[in-house]
């Protein structure tokens, strides 16, 4: 399981990536994250991030009927959100590249 402190800076970008594919509701986002290996992310963590995305104009939300139970709030990325996602991906790749280089160097020193 990935430590929550490590997830803090990346979870919002991962949620944007999920809702960029198709409109999705909170529980389904949590399930997709779990399927990708993020472990069980509490909906209480996901919903504040979704609301922030919506407040900042990065996502739109609409209620849709559910086959079971009450209506669900589906989130979709806006054009501004897609730009932010592209920026996140570029920054994330830069960060992971730097971390990989450092870890590779450390690995070479320990042998």
PLM regions: where:
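Short, hydrophobic-biased segments on the C-terminal half of alpha helices
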Residues: 47-54
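Basic, amphipathic "hinge/linker" alpha-helix immediately C-terminal to the N-terminal HTH DNA-binding motif
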Residues: 71-89
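N-terminal helix-turn-helix DNA-binding core of bacterial DNA-binding proteins
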Residues: 3-47
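Short, well-ordered turn and helix-capping elements at secondary-structure junctions
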Residues: 33, 37, 63-65, 79
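Amphipathic alpha-helical dimerization/coiled-coil segments
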Residues: 83-111
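Beta-hairpin "wing" of winged helix-turn-helix
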Residues: 56-71, 76
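Short beta-strand/turn micro-motifs at beta-sheet edges
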Residues: 1-5, 62-64
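Short, charged/polar surface micro-motifs in flexible loops or helix N-caps
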Residues: 21-25, 55-56, 81
């Amino acid at each position: 399981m990935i430590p929550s402190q490590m997830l803090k800076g990346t979870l919002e970008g991962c949620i944007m990536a999920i809702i960029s594919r198709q409109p999705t509701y909170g529980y389904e986002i949590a399930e997709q994250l779990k399927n990708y290996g993020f472990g069980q992310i509490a909906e209480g963590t996901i919903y504040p991030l979704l609301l922030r995305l919506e407040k900042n104009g990065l996502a739109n939300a609409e209620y849709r009927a559910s086959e079971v139970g009450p209506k669900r709030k589906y989130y979709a990325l806006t054009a501004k959100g897609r730009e932010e996602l592209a920026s996140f991906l570029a920054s994330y790749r830069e960060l992971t590249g730097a971390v990989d280089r450092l870890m590779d160097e450390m690995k070479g020193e320990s042998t």
